[in-house]
């Protein structure tokens, strides 16, 4: 650089500025793509959470229907005049340990407690959180023109998007953990419902054969 004329130094400064500007544009483009991917992922997680809620509600409805079916079987036994020996009485399914462990009091296991996290810091796909730039800005100004203004703006947007990506990652992690717990609960409810249905079928067959 010492051997360059002032004109050549100025030309080189403009070349470096142009290259730096293009770099910040590429970085911003990649950051926006990453943010869009994050928003789509959170949207899909939210839709998946709604599906899990519907499935769990279905499990709860089956449980209620089976309660009514068991009452009907008991009434049919009485109507048919069947004398049931105390030792052969069917134990109330809901008094069992497995049932209580699965349904409990409906507190922490209810679908309403599985909260779907939304990207609270994202609005219409645009970064809403601003992170403080370094004192004096992100770049050291050389040409002090519109190109450096754009570079500063690009890097400011990148910083904001990075903050959003961090928050989205936390939201996704929390949502995935909550959904994994809900899937486990749905599996337990499905198993309990199956056992309850099997027991009811056995009672019905005995009633028919009697």
Curated annotation (Swiss-Prot):
Its main location: membrane. It is found in: Cell membrane; Synapse, Synaptosome. Residues 109-133 have a biased composition (Polar residues). The modification Phosphoserine is found at residues 5, 20, 23, 34, 110, 160. Changing residue 119 to A: Inhibits interaction with ZDHHC13 and ZDHHC17. A lipid is attached at residues 79-80, 83, 85, 87 (S-palmitoyl cysteine). GO terms for molecular function: syntaxin binding. Keywords: Acetylation, Cell membrane, Coiled coil, Lipoprotein, Membrane, Palmitate, Phosphoprotein, Protein transport, Repeat, Synapse, Synaptosome, Transport. Residues 23-76 form a coiled coil. SUPFAM superfamilies: SNARE fusion complex (SSF58038). Residues 104-135 are annotated as: Disordered. It comes from the Eukaryota. InterPro entries: SNAP-25_dom (IPR000928), T_SNARE_dom (IPR000727). (Microbial infection) Targeted and hydrolyzed by C.botulinum neurotoxin type A (BoNT/A, botA) which hydrolyzes the 202-Thr-|-Arg-203 bond; the in vitro reaction is not highly efficient. Expressed in non-neuronal tissues. The modification N-acetylmethionine is found at residue 1. GO terms for cellular component: adherens junction; azurophil granule; cilium; cytoplasmic vesicle; mitochondrion; neuron projection; nucleoplasm; plasma membrane. GO terms for biological process: exocytosis; histamine secretion by mast cell; protein transport. The record marks 185-186, 202-203 as: (Microbial infection) Cleavage. Belongs to the SNAP-25 family. Homotetramer (via coiled-coil domain), also forms heterotetramers with STX4 and VAMP3. Found in a complex with VAMP8 and STX1A. Found in a complex with VAMP8 and STX4 in pancreas. Interacts simultaneously with SNAPIN and SYN4. Interacts with STX1A. Interacts with STX12. Interacts tightly to multiple syntaxins and synaptobrevins/VAMPs. Interacts with ZDHHC13 (via ANK repeats). Interacts with ZDHHC17 (via ANK repeats). This is Synaptosomal-associated protein 23. It comes from Mus musculus (Mouse).
């Amino acid at each position: 650089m010492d051997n360059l004329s002032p004109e050549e130094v100025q030309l080189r400064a403009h070349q470096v500025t142009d290259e730096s500007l293009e770099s910040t544009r590429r970085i911003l483009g990649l950051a926006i793509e990453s943010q869009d991917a994050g928003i789509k992922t959170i949207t899909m997680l939210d839709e998946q959470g709604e599906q899990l809620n519907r499935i769990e509600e279905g499990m709860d409805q089956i449980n209620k229907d089976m309660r009514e079916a068991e009452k009907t079987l008991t009434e049919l036994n009485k109507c048919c005049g069947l004398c049931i020996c105390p030792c052969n009485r069917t134990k109330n399914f809901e008094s069992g340990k497995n049932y209580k462990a699965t349904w409990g009091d409906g507190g922490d296991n209810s679908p309403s407690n599985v909260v779907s996290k939304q990207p609270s810091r994202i609005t219409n796909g645009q970064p809403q959180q601003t992170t403080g730039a370094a004192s004096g800005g992100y770049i050291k100004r050389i040409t002090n023109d519109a190109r450096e203004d754009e570079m500063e703006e690009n890097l400011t947007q990148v910083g904001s998007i990075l903050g959003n990506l961090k928050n989205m990652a936390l939201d996704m992690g929390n949502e995935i953990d909550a959904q994994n717990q809900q899937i486990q609960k749905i599996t337990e409810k499905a198993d309990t419902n199956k056992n309850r249905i099997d027991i009811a079928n056995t009672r019905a067959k005995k009633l028919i054969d009697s």
